[in-house]
């Protein structure tokens, strides 16, 4: 996965996700929308087969890089928890 920052301000971030589709972006969007620091978390892919999606994050005056990093860490923790539970269940 390649990421390209298209825009970065004090409270807004636009990132192009090269080669990604809905699965990861929906998960990231859902996690970000649970954060009270987030005003907008959305993405758009004009032509899903040909275009790379662009993710937009707007915060309440907080550095969007910190917010997206925190959300990514929560997602990683959730995946770790799932893996532990799964391994325990299939023993």
Curated annotation (Swiss-Prot):
Domain of life: Archaea
SUPFAM superfamilies cross-referenced by the UniProt entry: RBP11-like subunits of RNA polymerase
Gene Ontology terms: cellular component: cytoplasm; DNA-directed RNA polymerase complex
Location, primary (coarse class): cytoplasm
Swiss-Prot/TrEMBL catalytic activity: RNA(n) + a ribonucleoside 5'-triphosphate = RNA(n+1) + diphosphate
Entry keyword set: Cytoplasm, DNA-directed RNA polymerase, Nucleotidyltransferase, Transcription, Transferase
Molecular function GO terms recorded: DNA-directed RNA polymerase activity; protein dimerization activity
Keyword Transferase attached: yes
Example of a GO biological process term: DNA-templated transcription
Cellular compartments annotated: Cytoplasm
EC number: 2.7.7.6
Description of how the protein assembles with itself and partners: Part of the RNA polymerase complex.
Similarity field: Belongs to the archaeal Rpo11/eukaryotic RPB11/RPC19 RNA polymerase subunit family.
NCBIfam families: PRK01146.2-1
Function noted in UniProt: DNA-dependent RNA polymerase (RNAP) catalyzes the transcription of DNA into RNA using the four ribonucleoside triphosphates as substrates.
Protein known as: DNA-directed RNA polymerase subunit Rpo11
């Amino acid at each position: 996965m390649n990421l390209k920052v298209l825009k970065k301000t004090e409270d807004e971030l636009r990132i192009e996700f090269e080669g990604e589709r809905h699965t990861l972006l929906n998960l990231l969007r859902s996690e970000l929308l649970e954060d009270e620091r987030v005003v907008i978390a959305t993405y758009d892919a004009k032509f899903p087969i040909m275009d790379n999606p662009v993710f937009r994050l707007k915060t309440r005056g907080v550095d969007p890089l910190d917010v997206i990093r925190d959300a990514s860490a929560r997602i990683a923790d959730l995946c770790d928890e799932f893996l532990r539970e799964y391994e325990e269940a299939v023993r």
